[in-house]
């Protein structure tokens, strides 16, 4: 048996923590102002009415209402909040 660990096992053994990206509030859900709707890297989903876009492309509600996803041109999606 080898008495050394070998190059592979000593250089492995680390991983980055999960980033928790994705849709946090789905279509039809009620949200308050400031609620995070989507966490993303880049604008996979674009902001629509009554939502804001953060520095890290997080989409959040700017008013109280119901989440609505809708298609736009060129296979893009847009998320809006429809006020009650």
Swiss-Prot record:
Residues 1-21 are annotated as: Disordered. The lineage of its organism: Bacteria, Bacillati, Chloroflexota, Dehalococcoidia, Dehalococcoidales. The keyword Iron does not apply. One of its GO terms (molecular function) is structural constituent of ribosome. The keyword Ribosomal protein applies. One of its GO terms (biological process) is translation. Belongs to the bacterial ribosomal protein bL27 family. Transmembrane segments: none annotated. GO terms for cellular component: ribonucleoprotein complex; ribosome. Disulfide bonds: none annotated. PANTHER family: LARGE RIBOSOMAL SUBUNIT PROTEIN BL27M (PTHR15893:SF0), RIBOSOMAL PROTEIN L27 (PTHR15893). InterPro entries: Ribosomal_bL27, Ribosomal_bL27_CS. Keywords: Ribonucleoprotein, Ribosomal protein. Pfam families: Ribosomal_L27. This is Large ribosomal subunit protein bL27.
